[in-house]
Amino acid sequence: MKIYAITKKGEHSENEDRILINDTILSDGIFETECNGELKICIADGVGGNNAGATASSFVCENLKNIALIGKNDLIDINSKLLAKSTENVNYNGMATTLSGICIDDEKS
């Protein structure tokens, strides 16, 4: 399977989006790869207007990249960690990101 991903900041000063493809996190540019077997793709879109959207998106993708098949409890745990991180620094107050993703296990598909 061929995988293509593109993300760029556009007119904004910073790109708050992150794309996770297996263990690669893309923050700007074009990515192309081929994959046979397990596939994990996640898109974290930092919430504009909130503080530290890019930090939130990176944090979520970094935490997801080492989990083979992501489950509900993994997402709950990462959300709790993100909420805790938002209290560490006044610049992180209210940081948020959205998350969409898919995991494919070739042996089960």
Predicted feature descriptions by range:
Residues 1-109:
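PP2C/PPM-type serine/threonine phosphatase catalytic domain
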